[in-house]
Amino acid sequence: MEIEPNALSLNELQLQYSHKELEQYLKAKTTQLSEKSVLWFNKASTILWDTTQGIISKDTMNAIREYTLSNYKCHDSWGKIFGFVKSFLTHLTRTRMNSNYQSFDVYIEKPRVRKEIKLLTSRILTSDDVKNALISLESSNLPREKKQNFKTTLLFLAYTGQRVITVSRLTVKQVKDALTKTPNVLTVEANQDKIRLQHYVPLHPVLIPLLKDLTEGKQDGDLVFCYNEFMRWLFQNPVQLTNIDGKLQLKDLRKFFEQKSDEIGFNDANKNFIMSHGVSSINWTSYKQFLPENVYKRYIDCWGSVDINNSNSPN
């Protein structure tokens, strides 16, 4: 007598999927994602196929778990790989109309890790760190155009607190539009933001002439900042941080904006909105509303006197 699949325990059950199904799912999953996210999805997909060869069973799921825990020590890495596998099992459950696929995710749970709660970040950034990077740029042998692009990128990140990935997607048209408005407020579109939040970014007066120079003569669809080249330059020409043993990275400038904002009293909802940070609660999505002129006024009230570009500035 033939045993119905649902009558089998997971210990005995074996299911199949094709490499084509996995490729199609991966392609759909990685559409319009950042390079870093795509890299992790590709890595997880490779691990899944190499370990299972199209067979879903208790043994292959355990093999994925053991391989991942042995080769990756970071709790976040486990989550990314296991999360992809679980989502693919859910996909197979829906497309093949067989709930047994999803049942196998019980074998790929992350081990419980007790995390220490850090009350303070150990990475402290100050205006001196940004100034030192500016000095390093000014004394470099870079061509003028490249030097100006890197300098403007550095100051834009420091004065706005935007994510590097967001800044990398900004177009000449967006910046030109912001420069013609009163007040000068740039709109980041939802598809440019990590958490898909359309938000306003006030442009500090220090940035205005730099952005005008950077966008002059360029096409509307061009990207504004050469962030990849700047990241490579910083790697090859490291800038030592003043308060900790470490080198400046572009992502540090978001921390600088956060820490400097706390120092000068810019620590309300406007700051979080500008940074697109901590804004996913129901209170935010349902009740908060921001007008560009109000966001700009509050920002300038606090940040207006901060002149990082001036080596003699007390700020």
Where are each of the predicted segments found?
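Basic, Lys/Arg- and aromatic-enriched nucleic-acid-binding interface segment
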Residues: 79, 113, 119, 127-164, ...
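Active-site/catalytic core of tyrosine-dependent DNA strand-transfer enzymes
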Residues: 204-246, 252-257, 262
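Conserved tyrosine-mediated DNA breakage-rejoining catalytic core shared by Y-recombinases
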Residues: 160, 169-210
